[in-house]
UniProtKB/Swiss-Prot annotation:
Chain segments annotated as transmembrane: 531-551
Stretches assigned to the Extracellular side: 17-530
Protein name per the record: Hemagglutinin
Gene transcribed to yield this protein: HA
The species this protein was found in: Influenza A virus (strain A/Memphis/1/1971 H3N2)
Keywords: Clathrin- and caveolin-independent endocytosis of virus by host, Clathrin-mediated endocytosis of virus by host, Disulfide bond, Fusion of virus membrane with host endosomal membrane, Fusion of virus membrane with host membrane, Glycoprotein, Hemagglutinin, Host cell membrane, Host membrane, Host-virus interaction, Lipoprotein, Membrane, Palmitate, Signal, Transmembrane, Transmembrane helix, Viral attachment to host cell, Viral envelope protein, Viral penetration into host cytoplasm, Virion, Virus endocytosis by host, Virus entry into host cell
Glycosylation sites: 24, 38, 54, 97, 181, 301, 499
UniProt subunit comment: Homotrimer of disulfide-linked HA1-HA2.
Note: Major glycoprotein, comprises over 80% of the envelope proteins present in virus particle.
GO molecular function: host cell surface receptor binding
Listed GO CC annotations: host cell plasma membrane; membrane; viral envelope; virion membrane
Pfam families: Hemagglutinin
GO biological process terms held by the UniProt record: clathrin-dependent endocytosis of virus by host cell; fusion of virus membrane with host endosome membrane; fusion of virus membrane with host plasma membrane; viral budding from plasma membrane; virion attachment to host cell
Length: 566
């Protein structure tokens, strides 16, 4: 009879009709964490691809396609380069005394005056761009014995001949060109930028017809520097009907210093000075349209948001911009490790804890409880552990941005042909910096992701251990993130476990009694040995029946002949 009872008990267990803990005297409580059907793969220090519930993209890979005019003051060069505006090309007169944070040069810009070159073009362009102003002050230079205000048909201002408005072309007066020696002190408390030039005629005849002397000379000095230029007479490629050229030079005069100009011909004299300012203004080549909008970061492709720490839109930037990296994507984990919920668990879909899988549909928290008791099933989030994890993760993105955003601009680098080796070195340095930052960015994100996953796992374990300490011997760890509670635990009891007010002493006697009864069937009542012996006997009996049946079948077919001898 005891054997029959034991077999009946086992049969009920298999079919799930009588599960210890599923009756009114027991309950099951599982701890779990949030999960989503399709997570996001991120990289950590220990794993190239690990799935998390949520992640934030850190690389800005696209621009708005337009340059925002706020908060930076943008000056659109339109048809003018910065140097043409500086010299006073007639079609750039509208830029006189302009100011800017960023001067935007267009690919369609052109010169429309006397052909010129600037031996140190990049330095002059960068100097004026960083000053952020074309403020010009006219000074009373005295040029005695020469003709002033020379002009050319190649540089029309209105219907007649013209010239650069910031320069004064000096030629012979009657048949003489005396030696010029002019000084101009700087009695102000700021630097002054003087632009001057040297005319290179195309022929000797042009040289003498303009300056009398067969060869001129221009010397410009300060206490700190001196430049002497000898004109190079000779024909050059024709530009706007001219084969002669003007070379543009510049001199900075510090406060208390003196500008000295000495020449016996070929001088393109300054009319005054540009007031130099220090600042973070800059210049950028771009064909992106300028629009009314707000953006702190500008690239030649257009403005980009600076709410991400990295960007791969363009190396050239202006403003507070994300750091340029080579990667197209870097994802920062802002959620926990994702273990999608299994669709079926066991014969009747019993609940399971975090060790087996996560829980989908937990919209009110990252961590929580599920239970089965005499009143049914239920689920609730644990807001305290959820908030503890969120508080530590929320600041991650801002901290990464603070570490990486540049509060300065990366200007364009230009070099003349004779500075080719310097240009190559500069390119190598910039490429090395980008490689280094790209590596640092990947490492930084991997470290942060590792910390996030470890942190969220730790919060889950803390909640589990807290629950274990409350239940003590009143429940058994089922090994999958669940506890089998060996006493009647209604919804109020479950709530007390969740909020930390559970008193295990109240249920201790009931739990011990139920534990003994349930475990007795399994281990203490002798049923285990009976079950083993009965299973062995039945197996042997079935084996004998099968063997005997085979022998009888073989005898009937004549495959086996049995002789009985007496």
């Amino acid at each position: 009879m005891k054997t029959i009872i034991a077999l009946s008990h086992i049969f009920c267990l298999v079919l799930g009709q009588y599960l210890p803990g599923n009756d009114n005297s027991t309950a099951t409580l599982c701890l779990g964490h949030h999960a989503v059907p399709n997570g996001t793969l991120v990289k950590t220090i220990t794993n190239d691809q690990i799935e998390v519930t949520n992640a934030t993209e850190l690389v800005q890979s696209s621009s708005t396609g337009k340059i925002c005019n706020n908060p930076h003051r943008i000056l659109d060069g339109i048809d003018c380069t910065l140097i043409d505006a500086l010299l006073g090309d007639p079609h750039c007169d509208g830029f006189q005394n302009e100011t800017w944070d960023l001067f935007v040069e267009r690919s369609k810009a052109f010169s429309n005056c006397y052909p010129y070159d600037v031996p140190d073009y990049a330095s002059l362009r960068s100097l004026v761009a960083s000053s952020g102003t074309l403020e010009f002050i006219t000074e009373g230079f005295t040029w005695t014995g020469v003709t002033q205000n020379g002009g050319s048909n190649a540089c029309k201002r209105g219907p007649g001949s013209g010239f650069f408005s910031r320069l004064n072309w000096l030629t012979k007066s009657e048949s003489t060109y005396p030696v010029l020696n002019v000084t101009m002190p700087n009695n102000d408390n700021f630097d002054k930028l003087y632009i001057w030039g040297v005319h290179h005629p195309s022929t000797n005849q042009e040289q003498t017809s303009l300056y009398v002397q067969a060869s001129g000379r221009v010397t410009v000095s300060t206490r700190r520097s001196q430049q002497t230029i000898i004109p190079n007479i000779g024909s050059r490629p024709w530009v706007r009907g001219l084969s002669s050229r003007i070379s543009i030079y510049w001199t900075i005069v510090k406060p208390g210093d003196v500008l000295v100009i000495n020449s016996n011909g070929n001088l393109i004299a300054p009319r005054g000075y540009f007031k130099m300012r220090t600042g973070k203004s800059s210049i950028m080549r771009s064909d992106a349209p300028i629009d009314t909008c707000i953006s702190e970061c500008i690239t030649p492709n257009g403005s980009i948001p600076n709410d991400k720490p990295f960007q791969n839109v363009n190396k050239i930037t202006y403003g507070a911009c994300p750091k340029y990296v080579k990667q197209n994507t870097l994802k920062l984990a802002t959620g926990m490790r994702n273990v999608p919920e299994k669709q079926t668990r066991g014969l009747f879909g019993a609940i399971a804890g975090f060790i087996e899988n996560g829980w989908e549909g937990m919209i009110d928290g990252w961590y929580g409880f599920r239970h089965q008791n005499s009143e049914g099933t239920g689920q609730a989030a644990d807001l305290k552990s959820t908030q503890a994890a969120i508080d530590q993760i929320n600041g991650k993105l801002n901290r990464v941005i603070e570490k990486t955003n540049e509060k300065f601009h990366q200007i364009e680098k230009e070099f003349s042909e004779v500075e080719g080796r310097i240009q190559d070195l500069e390119k190598y340095v910039e490429d090395t910096k980008i490689d280094l930052w790209s590596y640092n960015a990947e490492l930084l994100v991997a470290l942060e992701n590792q910390h996030t996953i470890d942190l969220t796992d730790s919060e889950m374990n803390k909640l589990f251990e807290k629950t274990r300490r409350q239940l003590r011997e009143n429940a058994e760890d089922m090994g999958n993130g669940c506890f089998k509670i060996y006493h009647k635990c209604d919804n109020a009891c479950i709530e007390s476990i969740r909020n930390g007010t559970y008193d295990h002493d109240v249920y201790r006697d009931e739990a011990l009694n139920n534990r003994f009864q349930i475990k007795g069937v399994e281990l203490k009542s002798g049923y285990k040995d009976w079950i083993l012996w009965i299973s062995f006997a039945i197996s042997c009996f079935l084996l004998c029946v099968v063997l005997l049946g085979f022998i009888m079948w073989a005898c009937q077919r004549g495959n086996i002949r049995c002789n009985i001898c007496i």
